[in-house]
């Protein structure tokens, strides 16, 4: 019984390795180095431009700042916390 379980586990392990290798071969290793793949990764990690200014970002009015921030009334004008904590 123990031998049968060990043989079954060995066969399942071999099948896993074989299917993983076949899948890798199907995709191709050069796909990871292709310019299209690099461009898609750049697009994913590209910083998004926000419609509002973050903390200490320059502003001219309160609407320029993100939620829970307001534009400082005196020079230098930048976004500061408005002392609110609600969502």
UniProtKB/Swiss-Prot annotation:
GO molecular function: ion channel inhibitor activity; potassium channel regulator activity; sodium channel regulator activity; toxin activity
Tissue expression as described in the entry: Expressed by the venom gland.
SUPFAM superfamilies xrefs: omega toxin-like
Coiled coil residues, start to end: none
Propeptide residues, chain positions: 22-50
GO cellular component: extracellular region
Keyword hit for Amino-acid biosynthesis: no
Location in or out of the cell: Secreted
Signal peptide start-end: 1-21
Record's comment describing the protein's domains: The presence of a 'disulfide through disulfide knot' structurally defines this protein as a knottin.
S-S bonds: 52-66, 59-71, 65-79
Protein name: Mu-theraphotoxin-Cg1a
Plastid is among the record's keywords: no
Its biological purpose: Potent and selective inhibitor of hNav1.7/SCN9A (IC(50)=610 nM). Also shows a weak activity towards Nav1.3/SCN3A (IC(50)=7950 nM). In addition, inhibits voltage-gated potassium channels (Kv) in rat DRG neurons. It does not alter the voltage dependence of activation, but it causes a small hyperpolarizing shift in the steady-state inactivations of Nav1.7/SNC9A.
A family per Pfam: Toxin_12
Entry-linked InterPro entries: Huwentoxin-1
Entry keywords, A to Z: Disulfide bond, Ion channel impairing toxin, Knottin, Neurotoxin, Pharmaceutical, Potassium channel impairing toxin, Secreted, Signal, Toxin, Voltage-gated potassium channel impairing toxin, Voltage-gated sodium channel impairing toxin
Record family assignment: Belongs to the neurotoxin 10 (Hwtx-1) family. 39 (Jztx-34) subfamily.
